[in-house]
Each structure stands twice: as C-alpha cells, then as structure tokens.
C-alpha cells in the first residue's frame, strides 16, 4: 500500500518527504484555508517537493465550473489530480475530465455504491472516509473492504485512497482491507514510526556502548 500525506502544510510535506516514504499528497479547501495561502501557489510548491500524484480540489458545486476549475488546475503540473466531491454534478464533471485524460479523485465517499458510480464515471481514485464513518457508529474499514472486493471482482482499475485516517490502526486496517493507498496526516505518520520498545532498545544500546567504550571513543 502506498502512503500519501494529507496536508497543505509545506513544511510537513517536506519533512515527510525526507523520510522517503511518500508517494503523493492530498489537499482540500479546509487544509488550504488553514495555511492562509493561495491555492495555486501552495499546489505548485507541493509539486516541487513530491514527485507523485497531488490532489487539488475544486471549489464549485456546479459541474460546468468544476470542469473549468479542473482544467485550470491540471495545467499547473503533470502530477495534478483533480479532487471532486461525490455528488451528481461531480460525477458529470469526472466523466468529462476523464475523457480529456485529466486524472480525478472522487472524495467524500461513504458507501461502496458511491465508489462504484465514481469508478464507472471514470475516476482515477476514490476516497472513502474512515474516521467520519466511525464517528457515526459505522465501521469505516468495512466500506473499504467492500470497495476493494468489488473492484477486484469486476476488474475495476480505479484505485482506493483510504482517507480521514486518524490513527496508525486505521492505516493497518486499510492496508489489510486491500486499499491501494492511505492518505495520512503528518502526526500519524510520525506515530507510525514510534514504539516504546524501540525507544527502550535504543537507550539500552547506547548505555551498553558507553559502558564498554566510553562516550568519546
């Protein structure tokens, strides 16, 4: 499973990229607004850091304007993926953009049926939301499992991006459920790298070395 980072914070992206684990980036209007910067400016800078799919979301909810925004965003860089919300207008926009060779990521997926419609409309990626489904008492990972099984049975090429990831356990569950990608906040990526026994082991190694050879040898 590939790892994307879910943020518009360039410094977080830079730090995560240095780890050598990133394959792409996802952003959304909320994340862009949090940074207080121009969308195109942020996206262009992200593209200079990560050589992989970069999802940038349209703002309009009317399909003609979605198409217009998508075309303009796609001109920024060859790696741009147009992120479009799951709705009737969004499906129409995905259908047009996909026929033009523009990659799309249908977001705010909360059911396997939504994922099927998005895939058939031509979406490159679908993004089911784990955490938000968990919030309402559903098991988000079950939706990912259903989508993965359905796509495999019907040989659908659309890739699954597990989104709304809040914990390392979400990442593990997504990987085991067959998701192609998980898009993960920076803090969760760092949490994934930590384990109490690792810290204890490193501390013991250092103490043993210093005891045997001294600090300056």
From Swiss-Prot:
Q: Which PROSITE patterns match?
A: TRANSALDOLASE_1 (PS01054), TRANSALDOLASE_2 (PS00958)
Query: InterPro entries annotated for this entry?
Result: Aldolase_TIM, TAL/FSA, Transaldolase_3B, Transaldolase_3B/F6P_aldolase, Transaldolase_AS, TSA/FSA_arc/bac
Q: Which UniProt keywords apply?
A: Cytoplasm, Pentose shunt, Schiff base, Transferase
- The yes or no answer to whether the keyword NADP is present is no
Catalytic residue positions: 83
* E.C. number(s) listed in UniProt: 2.2.1.2
Q: Which CDD domains match?
A: Transaldolase_FSA
Against NCBIfam families, the record matches this protein to:
fsa_talC_mipB
Top enzyme class, one word, equals: transferase
Q: Which gene encodes it?
A: tal
> What does the function comment of this entry state?
Transaldolase is important for the balance of metabolites in the pentose-phosphate pathway.
Q: What does the UniProt entry say about where the protein is found?
A: Cytoplasm
Protein name according to UniProt: Probable transaldolase
User: Single GO cellular component annotation?
Assistant: cytoplasm
Which pathway does this polypeptide act in?
A: Carbohydrate degradation; pentose phosphate pathway; D-glyceraldehyde 3-phosphate and beta-D-fructose 6-phosphate from D-ribose 5-phosphate and D-xylulose 5-phosphate (non-oxidative stage): step 2/3
An individual GO BP term = carbohydrate metabolic process
Which family is this protein grouped under?
A: Belongs to the transaldolase family. Type 3B subfamily.
């Amino acid at each position: 499973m590939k790892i994307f980072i879910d943020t518009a914070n360039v410094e977080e992206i830079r730090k995560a990229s240095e780890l050598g684990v990133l394959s792409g980036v996802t952003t959304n209007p909320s994340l862009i607004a949090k940074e207080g910067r121009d969308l195109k400016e942020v996206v262009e800078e992200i593209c200079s850091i990560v050589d992989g799919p970069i999802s940038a979301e349209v703002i309009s909810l009317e399909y003609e304007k979605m198409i217009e925004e998508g075309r303009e965003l796609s001109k920024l860089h060859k790696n741009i993926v147009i992120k479009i919300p799951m709705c009737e207008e969004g499906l129409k926009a995905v259908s047009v953009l996909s026929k033009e060779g523009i990659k799309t990521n249908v977001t705010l997926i909360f059911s396997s049926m939504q994922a099927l419609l998005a895939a058939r409309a031509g979406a490159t990626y679908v993004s089911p939301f784990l955490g938000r489904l968990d919030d309402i008492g559903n098991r988000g990972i079950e939706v990912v499992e259903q989508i993965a099984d359905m796509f495999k049975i019907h040989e659908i090429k659309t890739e699954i991006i597990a989104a709304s990831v809040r914990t390392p356990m979400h990442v593990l569950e997504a990987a085991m459920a067959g998701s192609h990608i998980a898009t993960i906040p920076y803090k969760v990526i760092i949490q994934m790298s930590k384990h109490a026994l690792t810290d204890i082991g490193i501390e013991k190694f250092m103490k043993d070395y210093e005891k045997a050879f001294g600090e300056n040898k």
